[in-house]
Amino acid sequence: MKKIVNSIYDVYSEKLPRSFDGIKLAMLSDLHDNVYGISLEKLYGMIVEQEPELVIVAGDLLTRKHSDGSDEVVGLLKRLADRYPVFFANGNHETKVKVYTEKYGDRYNKLMQALKKAGVKILNNGHLDYKKNGELIHIYGLEIGREFFLIRNRPSMKEDYISGLIGMPLDGYGILIAHNPMFFKQYAAWGADLVFSGHVHGGIVRLPFAGGVLNPDYTLFPHYDGGEYREKNSTMLLGRGLGTHTINVRINNPPELVTAVLHRG
């Protein structure tokens, strides 16, 4: 059975409402149809053991080149949604399957229908409020264009790009689900207090003292490879993911569940 690690982070913000002080969130990313073959039962048990109040899914449930496994992954999310509010935003694999229907048919629509039926809250360039004791936080889901995942000729992200998709952030504490961590500075400038990201699979191979070796655009030793990052008043928690796709290996890089404990202060 493949090992799964749980990384726990304490995140502090003066903006966090008092009712949310100590709230715990579990974050999953990059399950990729479970091609890598972790025990989803074990993962479910680990999440339940953490007793989160919310579950965040930061994209890439499926793998664009693979057509099996989505039912198993959706089944996991249904079990989670029966216990907790589960919030999902697309990763680049969902976006590609959605755009290229001539190649992938109705896979995207089937996935979205299955997630809705499972009770998952889908936030693709939208937001929902989560309320507690008369106070609330905002949870946003960002789906950026495929051009921002290109290996060559990737454009820079204009200052108003994010607000053009999801508007300006509302007053109060805001969580942004944004699959691609490479634009963390833009997410922070937009006004996200906490960002959940994935995409880079921890750099595929991790070396002692050096971190991840390779990201999806074939950058060696990328700055954003996993863990906690700060940019002014924003924090990003970058999960190392739970699966693989094109390169079906993870060396010194076990699949990762992320647990975030939010604190006012």
Predicted regions and their residues:
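Acidic, histidine-bearing metal-coordination/catalytic regions of metal-dependent phosphoesterases
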Residues: 1-35
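Beta-strand-turn-beta hairpins that frame and shape the catalytic cleft
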Residues: 13-26, 120, 127-139, 169-171, ...
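Acidic/histidine-rich helix-loop elements
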Residues: 25-41, 61-71, 95-106, 148-156, ...
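Active-site neighborhood of phospho(di)ester-bond hydrolases with catalytic His/Asp-centered motifs
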Residues: 27-29, 54-60, 85-92, 123-126, ...
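Solvent-exposed loop/turn segments at secondary-structure junctions
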Residues: 33, 61-64, 92-96, 128-130, ...
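Core catalytic region of metal-dependent phosphoesterases/phosphodiesterases
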Residues: 39-130
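Binuclear metal-dependent hydrolase catalytic cores centered on His/Asp/Glu-rich metal-binding motifs
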Residues: 98-120, 127, 132-174, 184-185, ...
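Conserved beta-sheet core of the metallophosphoesterase superfamily
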Residues: 180-258
